[in-house]
Amino acid sequence: MDRNQQLFERAKHVIPGGVNSPVRAFGSVGGSPRFIKRAQGAYMWDADDRRLIDYIGSWGPMILGHAHPAVVEAVQQAAVHGLSFGTPTEAEIGIAEEICKLMPSIERVRLVSSGTEATMSAIRLARGFTGRDAIIKFEGCYHGHSDSLLVKAGSGLLTFGNPSSAGVPEDFTRHTLVLEYNNVEQLERTFAEIGERIACVILEPVAGNMNLIRPSAAFVQALRTLTQQHGSVLIYDEVMTGFRVALGGAQSLHGIQPDLTTLGKVVGGGMPIGAFGGRADIMNCIAPLGSVYQAGTLSGNPVAVAAGLATLRLIQQPGFYDALAARTARLVDGMVAAAREAGIPFSGDCVGGMFGLYFAADVPTSYAEVTASDRERFNAFFHAMLEAGVYLAPSAYEAGFVSAAHTDADIDATVDAARQAFARI
């Protein structure tokens, strides 16, 4: 039994399932998870001192790579002055100003401590602003683990959702309608029937929790048009895509200005942070100005803010996103070509520094299509890549991430490993 296995067995005695977030347990792919002891740049080292080329990047935040010197220095300097105050600070004004500058749809922004907290608060705010209860989300999209969003589709159109987790009362989900991603006709029919009841629509503007799925231009335009026509709030959940797919987030790629935006991951530079913001008239409904309550002991934590602000400044360097997108495309194109050489049905897609790999002949456009891909073959591929020192997401339904620290040599080594893995499976 290696050190990783020993730690996993030890963890299971004191931590449910041995992990603090389910996907880390390798339940989808089998085997024992890797316990990471340190990371630098594009690499992580596990408990057995095996170096891994990392394509998870803490599930998105590490856009600069691990332990970037400028971010580490910012954290160290902030920590010297105190870890938490429970008061306003000048630094939180600075990061708020930076967010508003980079995302013009955000006129006011509130800091929180996680992406889940951001989406939960945005939903509450939209309901308070509109005076309505019903919300729309889309099949396969993940918006954190708050009760009203842990919902699966009902039995038919206009049937409100059912809980997708034990412990969530049906009353929490009876106002949540789950529709198909990229289905414009279904969206139009729903608004025609109950548009006056819909408080908000929340969307992953590039879905990253059913692997990577792009929205069609017609779909996002229909969302913007219908929500405006019916007085509903359009929420872009950019916890994953914000500052990851483009400097202005996915909304800058779509040419769409949502009413509210949720952020996390990159905005914290690897530290726990989240944010939600948008139109001033909506944000002014939040306490202490308005009647929608939201609060947090660690909101605006000075150490997290320091990491986030350092990251936001670095990603504004000229050419940063062009280089990141080119490197990500090089990875995806190389892996698709390697699969083609092996005669394996396989496709890939990428947006900015996010990518998706699918054991299917064509890039999927919906939850149904992505779940129809060959999961068993993915699992075999995942383990072959892991043995070769490449750390991909341990699930066929999660996006991957490239950082600015990945080099062409890292990409080439990954493609070579994939070529050997495809030959084995």
UniProtKB/Swiss-Prot annotation:
GO terms for cellular component: cytoplasm. Its EC number is 5.4.3.8. Its main location: cytoplasm. Pathway: Porphyrin-containing compound metabolism; protoporphyrin-IX biosynthesis; 5-aminolevulinate from L-glutamyl-tRNA(Glu): step 2/2. It is found in: Cytoplasm. Its cofactor is pyridoxal 5'-phosphate. One of its GO terms (biological process) is protoporphyrinogen IX biosynthetic process. Pfam families: Aminotran_3. It catalyses: (S)-4-amino-5-oxopentanoate = 5-aminolevulinate. Keywords: Cytoplasm, Isomerase, Porphyrin biosynthesis, Pyridoxal phosphate. It comes from the Bacteria. GO terms for molecular function: glutamate-1-semialdehyde 2,1-aminomutase activity; pyridoxal phosphate binding; transaminase activity. The modification N6-(pyridoxal phosphate)lysine is found at K265. PANTHER family: GLUTAMATE-1-SEMIALDEHYDE 2,1-AMINOMUTASE, GLUTAMATE-1-SEMIALDEHYDE 2,1-AMINOMUTASE 1, CHLOROPLASTIC-RELATED. Homodimer. Belongs to the class-III pyridoxal-phosphate-dependent aminotransferase family. HemL subfamily. This is Glutamate-1-semialdehyde 2,1-aminomutase. It comes from Laribacter hongkongensis (strain HLHK9). The gene is hemL.
